[in-house]
Amino acid sequence: MKALSPVRGCYEAVCCLSERSLAIARGRGKGPAAEEPLSLLDDMNHCYSRLRELVPGVPRGTQLSQVEILQRVIDYILDLQVVLAEPAPGPPDGPHLPIQTAELAPELVISNDKRSFCH
């Protein structure tokens, strides 16, 4: 906003600002705001493309409407909820053998004479 000069009165400055505000509100000052719906449309199309990539089972070569994409997303979310609601599988019923560190990497086992160097 410009500073008010003593030559130009306050009333004149306020009128100028209010006319500019009305022009913007009525749409005469179309600039970047006019491009906004197009950028929103591009963003939405990008989001639908991203959903198509993320949801498994969507055929690559077929055209799907936005409603079909959303329906597949909803079905996928419901499938995930069912899987998460199932109880986790327990340990196997067979014999459980503990893993011995010495069997896997003997160099990791510290002998008593080497422990004295640590303290």
From Swiss-Prot:
GO terms under cellular component: cytoplasm; nucleus
Record keywords: Biological rhythms, Myogenesis, Nucleus, Repressor, Transcription, Transcription regulation
Gene Ontology MF terms in the entry: bHLH transcription factor binding; leptomycin B binding; protein dimerization activity; protein domain specific binding; transcription corepressor activity; transcription regulator inhibitor activity
One Pfam family of this chain: HLH
A biological process from GO: muscle organ development
Domain bHLH span(s) in chain numbering: 28-80
Cellular localization per UniProt: Nucleus
Top-level lineage group: Eukaryota
InterPro entries, sorted: bHLH_dom (IPR011598), DNA-bd_prot-inh (IPR026052), HLH_DNA-bd_sf (IPR036638)
Subunit structure: Homodimer, and heterodimer with other HLH proteins. Interacts with COPS5 and COPS7A. Interacts with IFI204. Interacts with GATA4 and NKX2-5. Interacts with ANKRD2; both proteins cooperate in myoblast differentiation. Interacts with CLOCK and BMAL1.
Described purpose of this protein according to its UniProt entry: Transcriptional regulator (lacking a basic DNA binding domain) which negatively regulates the basic helix-loop-helix (bHLH) transcription factors by forming heterodimers and inhibiting their DNA binding and transcriptional activity. Implicated in regulating a variety of cellular processes, including cellular growth, senescence, differentiation, apoptosis, angiogenesis, and neoplastic transformation. Involved in myogenesis by inhibiting skeletal muscle and cardiac myocyte differentiation and promoting muscle precursor cells proliferation.
Official protein name in the record: DNA-binding protein inhibitor ID-3
Species this protein is from: Canis lupus familiaris (Dog)
Lineage, opening ranks: Eukaryota, Metazoa, Chordata, Craniata, Vertebrata
Gene this chain is encoded by: ID3
